Amino acid sequence: MCSSDLFFTNSNVLFYIAAYLVGSIPFGLLLAKQFAGVNVQEAGSKSIGATNVLRVVKQTNPSLAKKLGIATVLLDAIKGVVVLLIAMSMGMSQETLWAIAVLAVLGHCYSAYLGFEGGKGVATGLGVFLVLIPMPALIGAAVWGFCAKVLKVSSVSSLIGLVAVVIAAIFMNDGVGVDSNAPMYIITFIIFYKHIPNIVRLIKGEESKVV
């Protein structure tokens, strides 16, 4: 049986669908609506991610904003991890695990429940990286934390942290454990692509800080 046959077994396809659908759950949107009564898709950057949840809710309830922001980060990261861990427990190949990771990030960024709108993919990407390439992911998280504290610009900090993950994975692990680094690059590309509006605002000097 060729590798493509193994890649597209019935059980694998079910995992791929589950990864995308679970990744599509818009936790930031749901939390902000439930606990703050606001629709983050209609305010701020209109993203469903933690940064926009924090920014929008902070306007009326700063203490709640921090709690919802943290909860959004954690839930967005966890939703990328859940299907991965189940697949790992069943002995799925690294190629299959990376496909699941890519689809989880795609689900967050292009949610099936929101007309294929979504967030920027940072927390979900970090979640899957922590499972598949933990040390590079931890380095990237540390770089992100440092940059966030110094620069106070979420988008820039996230992208710098993401680049740190990629560089660390290449040098520490000699890649991601499969024949190609393509899955890691695809996730990186998706996240960068979703940040294009932020990059444009940054160039114009209009990107907001999150303090």
Spans of features found by a protein language model:
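Nucleotide and nucleotide-moiety/phosphate-recognizing core
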Residues: 60, 68-74, 78-112, 144-145, ...
